[in-house]
Amino acid sequence: MQLKTFAVLFLIVLAACQSNESKTSTATGPMTINGAGATFPYPIYSKWFDEYQKAHPNVRINYQSIGSGGGIKQLTAQTVFFGASDGPMTDAQLQAAPGAILHFPTVLGGVVPVYNVTGVTQPLRFNGTVLADIYLGKITKWNDAAIANLNPGVKLPADDIAVVHRSDGSGTTYIFCDFLSKVSPDYKQKVGVATSVNWPAGVGAKGNEGVSGLVRQTPGAIGYVELIYALQNKMSYGSVQNKAGQFVTASLDSVTAAATGATMPDDFRVSITNADGANAYPIASFTWLLLYEHPKDAARGSAMVDFLKWALTDGQKFAPSLGYAPLPQPVVAKEMQALGKIQ
C-alpha cells in the first residue's frame, strides 16, 4: 500500500515538474518589446531590429511606423514601451507624460521637396520663401516668376501646383515647418511648427509612403518626404538654398554638414534646420528614440539600453546605404553616458 502511495506521489511530482518546465520554456522565449512612431526612420529601424535579433534571438523588437505624433501619444499612454519622433517633444508634452522621458538621437536625415512636373527632367531649385509661399497657397502655378527666377533655362509648364502634405502627426512635417518658419515670417505666423498643423492649402496623405504615392500619381504635385523615400521611389527632388545662399542637394555629406556646428544640449533636443555652413543641407534633422527614464519593466528597459548601445555603434554602419548619415562621434559619446540614467 505504501509503495502504491509513493508511486502516485511520484507521478504527481513528475507531472508538476514537467508543467513547470513547459512554463519556463515559454517564459524564456524571445522577449517582445513594442514601439511606435516616426515613419522618417522606419527603413533604418526595420534593418536594425532585424539585424539585432539575428545576434540576440532572445529579443524581438516590433515597431509601427504611425507617425511621430502617434508615437508620442502611445508612449505617453504607455501602450508601447518606446516611441520615436523626428521632432523633439515639447515641454508641455514632456510634462503631460506620467514619467520622465529621455531623447536619444539615432541617425541624421534630410527632408526633400519631391515633385511631379510634366516635361521637367532636370532637378529644380527651391528656396525657403518659395516653398513657404507654395504651402501657403500664394504660389499656385509651376511657371510662377518666383520659381522661374530660381531655375533659369528650365521650361516650366503653366500647370497648377497640387500641394501634398501629411495628414497624420508627423516629425517630417515638424522638420519641414521648422525650416520654413525660420525663413518665412508669414509662414511662422500662419502655420508655425508642430507635428500636426493647420494647412492653408493642399491635400493630406498618411506617412512618407502616402505622400510619395500621391505625388507620383498626381501630375503637377509637390510634397516633402525623407530622402530615402525619394530614392526608393525614384522620384524627382530639388535642391534647396541654404543659409549661406548655396543651393544644396540632400546627401550624406550635406546632412552631416548641417550637424557639424550644432551644440548638443544635455537633453538632446536640438534643431539643425537652416544651419550655418556653405555645404549644409537646410532641411536636415536628427531623429530620436524616446524612452522612459524609469521604465516599469526593468528587464525590457535593460534590453533597450543594450539595443541602443549596439545601434549607436555597430548599427551605424547600416545607415549610409539607406540614405541616413551616421551620428557624429561626440554625440554618440554623450548618449552612451546618458543611457546610464535608464534604470
Language-model segment annotations:
Residues 13-16:
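C-terminal motif of bacterial Sec signal peptides marking the signal peptidase cleavage site
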Residues 1-7:
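Bacterial N-terminal signal peptides that target proteins for export
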Residues 18-343:
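Flexible loop/hinge segments at secondary-structure junctions
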